[in-house]
Swiss-Prot record:
GO terms for cellular component: Golgi cisterna membrane; Golgi membrane. Keywords: Disulfide bond, Glycoprotein, Glycosyltransferase, Golgi apparatus, Lipid metabolism, Manganese, Membrane, Metal-binding, Signal-anchor, Transferase, Transmembrane, Transmembrane helix. Disulfide bonds join C77-C118, C189-C208. This is Beta-1,4-galactosyltransferase 4. The lineage of its organism: Eukaryota, Metazoa, Chordata, Craniata, Vertebrata. The keyword Transmembrane applies. Galactose (Gal) transferase involved in the biosynthesis of glycoproteins, proteoglycans, and glycosyphingolipids. Catalyzes the transfer of Gal residue via a beta1->4 linkage from UDP-Gal to the non-reducing terminal N-acetyl glucosamine 6-O-sulfate (6-O-sulfoGlcNAc) in the linearly growing chain of both N- and O-linked keratan sulfate proteoglycans. It catalyses: N-acetyl-D-glucosamine + UDP-alpha-D-galactose = beta-D-galactosyl-(1->4)-N-acetyl-D-glucosamine + UDP + H(+); a beta-D-GlcNAc-(1->3)-beta-D-Gal-(1->4)-beta-D-Glc-(1<->1)-Cer(d18:1(4E)) + UDP-alpha-D-galactose = a neolactoside nLc4Cer(d18:1(4E)) + UDP + H(+). Mn(2+) binds at D196, H289. N-acetyl-D-glucosamine binds at G258, E259, D260, D261, R301.
Amino acid sequence: MGCNPPYLLPYRLRLLLFFTLCLTVVGWVTSNYFVDPIQVIPKAKVFMASFYKVIPLGKEETLVHDATMEKVELGNCPSVSPNLRGQSKLIFEPDLTLEEVQAKNPKVSGGRYHPEECKAVQRVAVLIPHRNREKHLTYLLEHLHPFLQRQQLDYGIYIIHQTGSKKFNRAKLLNVGYLEALKEQNWDCFIFHDVDLVPENDFNLYTCGDQPKHLVVGRNSTGYRLRYSKYFGGVTALSREQFFKVNGFSNNYWGWGGEDDDLRLRVELHKMKISRPNPDVGKYTMIFHTRDKGNEVNVDRMKLLHQMSRVWKTDGLSSCSYRLLSVEHNPLYTNITVDFWTGV
């Protein structure tokens, strides 16, 4: 009677093991509940690391997803702009200043402009030879900038200024403009533009085609009639390749006259045909002026014209020598100042 029955010990042992197992399970559950309650997923870890990372000023945009930085590709501008107005009545205010013209063209810098709503089909450089014509230049810029903007052109205006006392050389200045402008931009089209001619109709497109273009069909000073059938002066348009092919203008026309006919002969020599706009479109106002000192009539022009076919390969872009004094990017135009130390 003093000893426990042999079957009672296994029962108590089983009961003890049961309670021990229960306590173990409870301890495991509670330890996982109270210890490390927040499980940070990998993406959250990356976000938190980026959040606390020190970013130098000006570098915040590097956190923006690349897709948000992509610029929407613009479509090409139409061949004929919807902004054209046609014939305009030109007004020239006697007290107009360059500052006033600049205020009207806030999006122009260094004479450069491009449309924001579409991609221009051509890059156009307008080259204007100049000396002592500040008022004419102001009038031309006043009308030419909005004229070109309505045509939705990617353009730049270059004024090529001849300093010194030698006779004026329009053709050589235009060669200089072509060479210097190409150092800044690979222009598709070049407009060779007299400073005293202002276009009246913006359907007269300042672009280049398969053939050279003569844009001045008529002007007020000639009753809006063509000066003569083969006239190729005033304002002309040649592509980069066309002008290079004929070796540009001759450099030997000092004073007034002959250089535009020389260029026409070069164009014809290369079997190119000159096109013109409709007479109602190719109309210009010529701002009145007297003959400039240093731009007297070139009495040798006919002799030079007869030499063209023999000398065109060696007289032109390939032989254009000049001293470049400065290139200034003014708000309304880029001014290129040169000196010709040889010549008349």
